Amino acid sequence: CVGLPGQTLEIKDRIIYLDGKANKEPDNVQYRYLVKTKRPIPDDLAHELGISKEDMMMYYTDASVYNMPLTEKAKAGLLARKDIVVSIENTPADDAGGLYPLNMYKNWTTDNYGPVWIPKKGETVKLTIENLPVYERPIHVYEGNELAVKDGKININGKETDEYTFKMDYYWMMGDNRHNSADSRFWGFVPEDHVVGKPIFIWLSLDNDRGWLDGKIRWNRLFTFVDNIK
């Protein structure tokens, strides 16, 4: 969860802002990059930097370019290898067609999104034809109201209105692998009755590229506490 009830969230050039302040990113946050190389990245270097074989699957042989997710640590590690890496550039974000809400704000992307106010229980939002798509799903699907637009006017449960008071708290979820996550940027707000718990610690972590006798268990991650749990 990166956004709480009542906060205003905006993403600017990949950075999350809450109520106008930049949010601290987790150490393991990943973004997708175009990595131009002189030769393929060796497996031992990839393993050292925490880059999986799956991460390196998108390799354009003719151009010697990987399209891959990297943490800041992995990015710095690759840039240090001048004998292998020529350059690392941001990938363009051009996915507005699949973002929430589907029927507006076509200039939004996963890297530049919002701002959106996250609904809070008991708080009232002013409704307009312009912002209705943002709040239509919480009002209609999650809180069970009949919602319609007639002659340019908003009607809730058969009555014309220009505001709505929310009955539940909502949250904004985003994955740490920012360019490979199906999260709130694609399906919107998460109502409180959909939240079933919160993570405390990692009890098992496996490396899919390794065998059981070859370092498959990531011992350094076992029983480590999840950051920012309150």
Q: What is each PLM-predicted segment?
A:
Residues 1-230:
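Extended hydrophobic leader/signal-anchor segments used for secretion and membrane insertion
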